[in-house]
Design a protein with these regions (language model features):
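Rhodanese-like catalytic fold shared by cysteine-dependent sulfurtransferases
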Residues: 1-21, 28-59, 68-106
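Short, surface-exposed ligand- or partner-binding patches at beta-edge/loop junctions that are enriched
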Residues: 63
Length: 106
């Protein structure tokens, strides 16, 4: 399972200053409720026409509410030739539970 990352592993990587592109594939209303600092919003439905916003040599972390839409985004990006994409397991909800309780749950 090389295409997933746990909330705690992501936190560790961010704390080390690793250059990661956090792509949140939820809808705008969800993003307005809770988001990871430094993430960019690209709703899953707009991902195909938004590929130019991403570079193939970046390490991309896909984020959603519980990890399902971001799994779809991860698979799509891999199919489009992005070699270094990971899905945040459990999504932002797991992040809130395991890493940062200040991030609202909904």
């Amino acid at each position: 399972m090389g295409f997933v990352i746990s909330p705690k592993e992501l936190k560790s990587r961010l704390d080390k200053g690793d250059q990661l592109v956090l792509v949140d594939v939820r809808e705008e209303w969800e993003y307005s409720l809770a988001k990871l600092e430094g993430s960019i919003l690209i709703p899953l439905g707009t991902l195909p026409q938004s590929l130019a916003r991403l570079t193939q040599d970046s390490e991309i972390i896909a984020i959603c509410h519980h990890g399902m839409r971001s799994a779809d985004a991860t698979n799509f990006l891999l199919q489009q030739g992005f070699p270094n994409v990971k899905n945040l397991v459990g999504g932002i909800d797991a992040w809130s539970i395991q890493v940062d309780g200040a991030v609202p749950r909904y």
